[in-house]
Amino acid sequence: MCVALCTVATALWSCDEDETYADQKEKERKAIAGFLSRNLTLLDAQGDTLLSTGKIKVITEQQFLAQDSVTNLDENEYVLFTNTGVYMQIVRKGPGEPIRSGESKRVICRYYEYNILGDSLQTSNQTPYWATNPEVLDVSNNSGSLTASFNTTLNGGGAMYMIYKNISVPNGW
């Protein structure tokens, strides 16, 4: 009987404390809107600026494609990829041709991953420790669908792989 009462009490207490999925999505939307509209500056332990976002101007994928798949840095543009919810600023397009169907290429990148709900830098490979180990991605085009995995054979893996221990590249990368 005592176990049954504890179970019921726990279930009732849990229901009062749990956020619904709709509540979580609303909280996420508000956090994203707040992040996009403020001027954020991330500092390292010595007080040096790591990243300053400025006020972000969001553009659509259609605008992004019309601009030759780059974002305007002077206007602090970020493209929103609606299928993943990822906002990305393309600093440089890079040399070479786009990956054709059936082809694979190696891509090297650096990144900041910011946790807007925790208001903190989550991970980054733009620190002296990771300077010699950028993210190395093996990207393939399978009939127009791009897939990628972190290459760990060249440098043992970059920060993203070492932190999350997964060779799968997050959606939107």
Language-model segments: which ranges?
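Sec-dependent N-terminal signal peptides
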Residues: M1-V8
